């Protein structure tokens, strides 16, 4: 994918959480082809490896340039794990200049299938009253505490 703008980020280090997902991998690519060294943080090592390989190959094909993109497996809601990952990133790529907190998601059990509560749907299995408190907490931890 060609980036429709030019920005010189040479010498900058960017960290992108949730970077193996569709949106954040595109952001990571834009940063990398603009010259930044990019650390992608995600939970799934295989997915990270696939995304980093794809971004590196795309940059060679589309821009005839080498980019620096590295994947780091980490759960952003585990502060100790996150701090360890950051120390590794700092030693390999340098201190963070650009941070994109893109990790996030949702889970069944934390959402309803009904947009508005109506009396006749009050007892539905997927209403507000049947939400799973633990799933809601997991989603909040990821989407709020993880950023």
Role assignments for model-derived ranges:
Residues 1-15, 129:
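Flexible N-terminal pre-Rossmann segment of NAD(P)-dependent oxidoreductases
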Residues 13, 20-22:
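Conserved glycine-rich cofactor-binding loop
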Residues 36-51:
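Conserved glycine-rich Rossmann-like NAD(P)H-binding loop of the short-chain dehydrogenase/reductase
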Residues 45-46, 72-85, 133:
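The beta1-alpha1 cofactor-binding region of Rossmann-like NAD(H)/NADP(H)-dependent oxidoreductases
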Residues 63-68, 88-101, 106-108, 129-132:
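A glycine-rich helix->loop->beta "capping" turn
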């Amino acid at each position: 994918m060609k980036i429709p703008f030019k920005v010189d980020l040479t010498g900058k280090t960017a960290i992108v959480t949730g970077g193996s997902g569709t949106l954040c991998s595109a952001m990571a690519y834009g940063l990398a082809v603009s010259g930044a060294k990019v650390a992608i943080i995600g939970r799934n090592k295989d997915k990270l490896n696939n995304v980093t390989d794809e971004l590196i190959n795309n940059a060679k094909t589309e821009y005839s340039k080498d980019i620096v993109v590295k994947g780091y497996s980490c759960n952003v809601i585990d502060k100790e794990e996150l701090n360890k990952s950051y120390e590794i990133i700092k030693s390999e790529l340098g201190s963070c200049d650009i941070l994109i907190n893109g990790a996030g998601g949702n889970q069944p059990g934390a959402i309803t299938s009904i947009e508005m509560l109506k009396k006749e749907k009050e007892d539905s299995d997927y209403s507000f009253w049947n939400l799973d408190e633990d799933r809601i907490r997991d989603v909040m931890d990821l989407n709020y505490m993880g950023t």
